[in-house]
């Protein structure tokens, strides 16, 4: 089948981009790893299985278009990352005054727990069924749900920087936050913590991680995800359930194959603006903005159930820009690749969590678990908060002392 062959060709090109990244950066765990762990299984493996099991020949052109879009974006991103800025020679004296992250990780852990506590109190009968909490808090609880997840992710990342000082403390903080994240009914951030940690080892500690470690990581994640689907969806084959669950591309194909009128950037604008306004501030905020409008049009039953509407991947961009979608992807890919390289250089130069958070965001690991909008300004604010918090130490006299920055 032509679609399967093209997906396989795209996978070969991704392998080439990864080997290129390894050769230039000298790291097995590099900028491509989040894409390999998160995106490749979803967009290529599971969707490939779905295409193989289903009759989609009538949508061949649409499938080829969107897989071309996928390759266009990742190629633009990786090439701009690798070739737009030289890697500086770092001066060891630049990392002399290291920030302190024990207090920072404790602070953000405390905030994550306190913010989510009202939800746990209200839905305490569902604590052993976190997915039910997730379903019941889709509307009106974002002011508790998302900040709590965000602070848990930030706390875990800050805890990484205490790993060399105290492994027990680091593991305890990360484990507590993973349990708290699990109680949100959202499994995605836990994988983000794992990916962030191996990137920390590679870019902060400069560990020479072997390729087999990456292979074993893939295997462990595959087992966990398969077990999750086997437990959650008791009917049918877990592999088929995963293939049916990874519906980004086929939903985008649904948009492209319909007579949907182009929105000329309206959906993108709504995703960038409306998603930033809490419903507590704007009670009358529309339910059908951005990609949710597509869900309302194409999956009205799921939309009105309000328990998580289907995602559309690049279908949202296609609804706005049509055949000009690849042009947008090239521009955004190059821009984000340049940003990622800048923050990569700063991360390796300063060994600091605030730059590391920005680097993670630029390569696809967001600490704000919101699917809409490009949350770069918000991540800058979070990075600044981490910078301020890490400038304090908890002294032996039980007081906070602002560290002087000797320049």
From Swiss-Prot:
EC number: 2.4.99.27
Superkingdom of origin organism: Bacteria
Catalytic activity: n lipid-linked O-antigen repeat units = a lipid-linked O antigen + (n-1) polyisoprenyl diphosphate
GO cellular component: plasma membrane
Sequence intervals crossing the membrane: 2-22, 31-51, 63-83, 101-121, 141-161, 168-185, 190-204, 211-231, 319-339, 356-376, 382-402
Entry's localization field: Cell inner membrane
Keyword set includes Cell membrane: yes
NCBIfam families in the record: glyco_rpt_poly
Function: Polymerase involved in the biosynthesis of the lipopolysaccharide (LPS). Catalyzes the polymerization of the O-antigen repeat units on the periplasmic face of the inner membrane, leading to the formation of the lipid-linked O-antigen molecule.
Protein name: O-antigen polymerase
Encoding gene, per UniProt annotation: rfc
